């Protein structure tokens, strides 16, 4: 008798489990409905501690403005900054940074290093491009927000997200916290 009760309870439990696990599938027919992605750009205020994207674009288009823009932010200049076997920059402006250790004549060990006080950043010039490097995530996020607010569209995501607008290209590398304007 007890065995029949256990079998009955097991069958009822299994029946309830199997019938309650199903989901109701709803399908709708959308005829002629097309969706277009809507991009909303918010007004982003550029940080007053380092160069804005607008100013970087201006420096690429008008190289004669480089000195006045970098002076406004208090950047120091180091010409012909070369990172040993890696990169070479015609001009390296840095602020709240110290230059890396010199390995050989005019060749440095690495990019400039941040100081603990203030927002550290550098602006490097290489083959017609301006590279803005920052050292904290909020400063990098501000730069990327400026790129998006300037109506640049993500063209190629990856290690360096490439944004395009007309013939202007901006690459944002989150790992290095750099923004390259060409």
Regions found by a protein language model. Give the residues of each.
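Long, charged/polar, surface-exposed segments that mediate recognition or autoinhibition
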Residues: 93-160
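Bacterial signal peptide processing site
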Residues: 22-25
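Post-signal peptide N-terminal segment of mature Sec-exported envelope proteins
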Residues: 29-53
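Ser/Thr-rich, low-complexity intrinsically disordered terminal regions
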Residues: 81-98, 160-168
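Amphipathic alpha-helical segments
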Residues: 58-79, 136-156
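C-terminal motif of bacterial Sec signal peptides marking the signal peptidase cleavage site
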Residues: 17-20
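Short, exposed beta-strand-loop hairpins at the edges of beta-sheets
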Residues: 157-175, 179-181
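Bacterial N-terminal signal peptides that target proteins for export
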Residues: 1-10
């Amino acid at each position: 008798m007890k065995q029949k009760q256990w079998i009955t309870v097991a069958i009822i439990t299994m029946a309830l489990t199997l019938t309650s696990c199903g989901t109701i599938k709803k399908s709708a027919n959308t005829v002629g409905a097309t969706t277009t992605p809507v991009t909303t750009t918010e007004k982003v205020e550029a940080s007053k501690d380092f160069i804005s994207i607008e100013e970087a674009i201006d420096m690429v288009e008008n190289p004669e403005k480089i000195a006045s823009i970098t002076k406004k932010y208090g950047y120091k200049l180091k010409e012909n900054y070369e990172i040993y076997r890696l990169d070479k920059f015609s001009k390296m402006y840095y602020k709240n940074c110290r230059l890396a250790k010199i390995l050989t004549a005019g060749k440095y060990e690495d990019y400039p290093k941040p100081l603990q006080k203030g927002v550290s950043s550098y602006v490097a010039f290489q083959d017609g491009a301006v590279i803005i490097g920052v050292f904290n995530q909020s400063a990098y996020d501000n730069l990327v927000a400026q790129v998006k607010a300037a109506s640049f569209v993500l063209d190629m995501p990856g290690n360096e997200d490439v944004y395009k607008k007309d013939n202007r290209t901006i690459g944002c590398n989150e790992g290095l916290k750099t923004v390259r304007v060409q």
